[in-house]
Swiss-Prot record:
This is NLP effector protein 2. The structure of NLP effectors is remarkably conserved with a high level of conservation of a central region containing the conserved undecapeptide motif AIMYAWYFPKD and heptapeptide motif GHRHDWE. Its main location: secreted. A motif (Conserved undecapeptide motif) lies at residues 90-100. Induction: Expressed strongly at the early stages of host infection (up to 24 hours after infection) but subsided quickly afterward. A motif (Conserved p motif) lies at residues 107-113. Keywords: Host cytoplasm, Secreted, Virulence. Probable secreted effector that may act as a pathogen-associated molecular pattern (PAMP) recognized by the plant immune system. Seems not to induce necrosis, neither in several susceptible or resistant Vitis species nor in the dicot model plant Nicotiana benthamiana. It comes from the Eukaryota. It comes from Plasmopara viticola.
Length: 223
């Protein structure tokens, strides 16, 4: 497949990237702070793209909100990207969902949601979490500093939920959730990065690609 061609494959056929062994301090910190996601309703996270750059075709808004999307047999994925922003370190963690469906015929194919964890600096010991900002309907909720009850150690606990008839969003929670294999932007294959930069996901958009990542940090900046 040419890297310049977009190719969609069935939502259940996309294989995630295995989580690489972290080498740099930034990679180690990103793994340490990997959040937990609790799915209250709707789809569970799925891989969005494979190493060839083939992308998840998603699902129509038919059947039950969690119909055909209660988890991939190949395993799931959380995508990460980090940057120094206005003097602090930001790590964005993002999940893809095949559909965003409050109820039958509501919502849309594809959903991207993300949470940004803000820390003083990337250090392996004594990491200081300054804020947690989950995405919600083109905006963010902001916890500065995070509620200790919304953390499991260093992992932010995040709830994914649709409050009918509104589409899904993320929010902090006291409920435990699941973690997925983390793949950072620079660890993705070039084909996967290219696909995430150019593929149009309808009413959803990839929040960590080259075109929108810094704008998301600007919008979410909590300090």
């Amino acid at each position: 497949m040419s890297p310049w061609e977009a190719k969609w494959i069935r939502h259940s056929e996309v294989r995630p990237f295995p989580q690489p062994e972290p080498i740099t301090v930034e990679e180690k910190v990103a793994v340490m702070l990997k959040p937990e996601i609790h799915v209250k309703n709707g789809c569970h996270p799925y891989p969005a793209v494979n190493d060839l750059g083939e992308t998840n075709s998603g699902l129509k808004t038919k059947g039950a909100p969690s119909g055909m999307c209660k988890g991939s047999g190949w395993g799931s994925q959380v995508y990460g990207r980090h940057a120094l922003f206005k003097g602090v370190w930001a790590i964005m963690y993002s999940w893809y969902f095949p559909k965003d469906m409050p109820s039958t015929d509501f919502g849309h194919r594809h959903d991207w949601e993300h949470v940004i964890v803000w820390i003083e600096k990337p250090v392996v010991e004594n990491v200081k979490i300054l804020a947690v900002t989950p995405s919600a309907h083109d905006g963010y909720s902001k916890q500065v500093p995070p509620n200790p009850g919304h953390l499991n150690g260093l992992a932010a606990k995040i709830n994914y939920e649709s409050k009918w008839p509104i589409n899904h969003a993320l929010e902090p929670t006291g409920l435990g959730g699941e973690k997925q294999d983390l793949i950072l932007w620079e660890q993705l294959s070039s084909n996967a990065r290219h696909a995430l930069n150019i593929v149009h996901w309808g009413d959803a958009n990839t929040p960590f690609n080259d075109y929108v990542f810094m704008g998301k940090l600007e919008k979410a900046f909590p300090l």
